């Protein structure tokens, strides 16, 4: 009974602040915190930059809610759902491909958001080059054409979802608009770039203006990350 209470307590503490880097505040015991965190099979990775580093695409408040509340909640929910189940031993990638129901929804949302943060950079927004640019020109006609197709497809996702750029094993590119938590991995494709078009992704900064958000999204795209994903897709 006491053990159970301890686990529940540390999970709650972790979801509230562990991922924001303030889990070892004064007076808290590091060993017990570490034990609690280690019990969770899935951990939200740190944000790859400070919360205010994506201005003016996103305000600090927008990122703090999106990363600290929404993204964190998918990990917390997932850890609760897999407790004592075989899924606790699976990788997050495997759960995205093979999972079902609520476990899939939370695993994919956990995965998708981590990928989304990596698709952005405070120094992003430059144009891609090399093989990736050549493939974009080959498959879409050029950067301007690709940007328009991806923007339109993402803006038009009905309800909540994601706009994806994905590659097959031959390196052919495809724009995949996806509902809810769907991910190209589920369809045998490798994700290269994504934009989150759930309202929670932009509502603090853009209110209902999804199109204006997706237009601004391009100013922070981390093309180096996209190119790395493309190189791995064809490997
Ligand atoms: Mn989101």
Question: Where do the language-model regions lie?
Answer:
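Short helix-capping/linker segments at secondary-structure and domain boundaries
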Residues: 19, 23, 118-128, 207-210
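Extracytoplasmic/secreted envelope proteins and their assembly/folding machinery
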Residues: 75, 114-117, 133, 147, ...
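C-terminal segment of N-terminal export signals and the immediately downstream linker at the start
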Residues: 20-54
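Alpha-helical scaffold segments that form or flank carboxylate-/histidine-based iron centers
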Residues: 56-70, 91-112, 180-182, 187-196
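All-alpha RGS (Regulator of G-protein Signaling) helical domain and cognate RGS-like helical scaffolds
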Residues: 69, 80-89, 94-98, 102-167
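Long, compositionally biased interface segments
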Residues: 220-234
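N-terminal secretory signal peptides and thylakoid transit peptides that target proteins
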Residues: 1-14
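An amphipathic alpha-helical core segment
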Residues: 152-224
């Amino acid at each position: 009974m006491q053990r159970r209470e301890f686990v529940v307590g540390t999970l709650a503490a972790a979801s509230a602040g562990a991922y924001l880097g303030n889990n070892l505040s004064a007076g808290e015991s590091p060993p017990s915190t570490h034990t609690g965190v280690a019990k969770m099979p899935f951990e939200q990775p740190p944000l790859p930059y400070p919360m205010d580093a994506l201005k003016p695409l996103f305000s600090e408040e927008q990122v703090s809610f999106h990363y600290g509340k929404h993204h964190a909640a998918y990990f917390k929910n997932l850890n609760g759902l897999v407790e004592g189940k075989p899924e606790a031993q699976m990788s997050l990638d495997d759960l995205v491909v093979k999972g079902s129901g609520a476990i899939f929804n939370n695993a994919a949302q956990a995965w998708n958001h981590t990928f989304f943060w990596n698709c952005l950079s405070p120094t992003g927004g430059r144009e891609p080059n090399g093989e990736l640019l050549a493939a974009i020109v080959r498959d879409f006609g050029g950067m301007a054409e690709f940007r328009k197709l991806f923007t339109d497809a993402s803006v038009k996702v009905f309800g909540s979802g994601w706009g994806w750029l994905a590659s097959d094993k031959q390196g052919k590119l495809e724009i995949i608009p996806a509902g809810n938590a769907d991910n190209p991995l589920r369809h045998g494709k490798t994700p290269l770039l994504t934009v989150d078009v759930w309202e929670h992704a932009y509502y603090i900064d853009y209110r209902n203006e999804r199109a204006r958000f997706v237009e601004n999204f391009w100013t922070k795209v981390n093309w180096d990350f996209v190119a790395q994903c493309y190189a791995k897709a064809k490997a």
